[in-house]
Amino acid sequence: MGRKQGESHREYKARMIDPVSDSFCGAKWYNATIWLGHGGTTSCHHPPAHQIDLEEIKTNPSAIHNTRHKKKMRDMMQKGDRPKECEYCWKIEDMEKDSDGNEPVSDRVYKTVIYEDEDLETAANLEPSFDVNLKTLEIAFNRTCQLACSYCNPAFSSTWVKDIRTNGGYQGIKSDARGHFIDDAPYAEPFDAGEFNPYVDAFWRWWPELSKELEEIRVTGGEPLMTPSIYKLFDWFKETDEPNAKNMRLAINSNLMAKGPLLNKFIDATQHIPHFHVYTSCEAIGSQAEYIRDGLDWEIWTSQFERFATEARYEGVHMMMTINALCLDTITEFWDWCLEMKRKYGHHVPGISVNILRFPSFQSPLTLPDHLRKMYHDEISDWLDAVRERGEKSELTGAELLQPWEEDQISRLIEYLDVVKTPHRNTAEQHLLHHDFKVFYEQYDSRRGFDFRKTFPRLVDWYDSIDVLDISDDHDIQAPDSVGVTNTLYAKRIVTEDGEVKVVEMKVRGRQTGESEDDYDDEKYKEEADYNPNIKRKAGSSIGWDTTVDGLGGTVDE
């Protein structure tokens, strides 16, 4: 049922959540993100992922969600104990009350309110060992993708993998300790193409039961249209006699750059899905969009967007913008294009979400010097003022062309550019961000055949003024070499049974090129104190990846 009419989120919390316990969250039972490529799972995007047990899913395919670790967390939540992996919410809830005396509302409220009261009551009283079916699921079958966006990395793009395998890791990046560009992220896809994947197999064995109760499945990647599993899912919607298929929402994150035959199959498949949503992405126009999202062709992408808007069957079309240092140069022109689409297809095609990039920090908009940030701040402010003054409405739907929630997001971006100084709490000093910005894009141009100066003429004076720093490699925790052995700082992390993310050791150790933290427990290191022969591969624990933030990584210490 969710909130009653007129009920605030605080009142909902008092009615539905607090009577269960001080730490209850419905997402631990009914929501999951699952990376089937390497077997990682988590209940929302705040806790780090943990590894699915290969032995357990042989007899219980639902264990791709109902892991022993999640059951431990459910038990804690029923008792009112706080899992430490959920510290994002606890930090919010421990903040002071506002001036009106209201306690802050954390994400666990928003992630619980979407479920029916009856389902939450069931979860509150279930034995923790009981297996539950999901209500909402985000899933990635693999990382296959034909794009290699500048701020993406090999964990999510096979084209990025090709870059690293062909050219080696990016050199000289000093500030960003997240390992985005070190190696080909072998942990993200341990199975070769065509090789049996037990996690994908478990998903399809669970699907007949899961599909009876699932309310929403969102498929991400990589690029979902490039994996056979998505067409198996499309066929299920077309052929199934499962009654819930008429109620289930299917959403796909797609870059809409699939070639003609695949796009044809995609559009045809939507005709058989009653509740379909597509989420696509862009944030600049023309050559700048093509530079940021390497592999995108602006003319093809805009044409295929319109073809989808015209021919597909859908409930929603969504534009996910990733706001980075480069897109601000033509962002208002991109919004103009979005408004033109809204005029043609309705105020909701597309719906625009503004998501500010924080990692890698040197590609954040906050890397830009003050004078450029002010220039873009003023341009965006002027654009929004003009749109508000026009007050344009859709001739098709009668609704405001730019919805209030979209205006709010753009307003937050304007404020962000004006007020916020660093992308995240661990951000390096500004001169290091500038150094990395230039070091990265010089290599990016060479590898990808681009020309930064030609593509972003308004940034050239600043770009050319950046000095590449002579910083000792002793301070470079991302210093892979294209050949031979390197000394790299490794941070070994685990997620304990109590949900605490722990860094159990940090040290410098030589490693071979292409070797990642997933090889940390290889037998050749058996003399080392932290060697564990029972843990061979860790979900998302590639060197430098901050599992406490990025939502990929860790292994359960059981």
Task: Give the predicted meaning of each segment.
Residues L134-T144, A155-Y199, S211-I230, T240-L262, ...:
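Core AdoMet radical
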Residues K97-K135, C145-L147, G168:
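Recognition helices and adjacent regulatory flanks at domain boundaries
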Residues M1-T42, P47-I57, D100-V109, V161-I164, ...:
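Radical SAM enzyme [4Fe-4S]-AdoMet core and its adjacent flexible, acidic
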Residues Y30-S43, E127-A155, L214-R218:
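N-terminal pre-triad scaffold of radical SAM enzymes
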Residues W90-D94, C152-S158:
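Detector for the c-type heme attachment site
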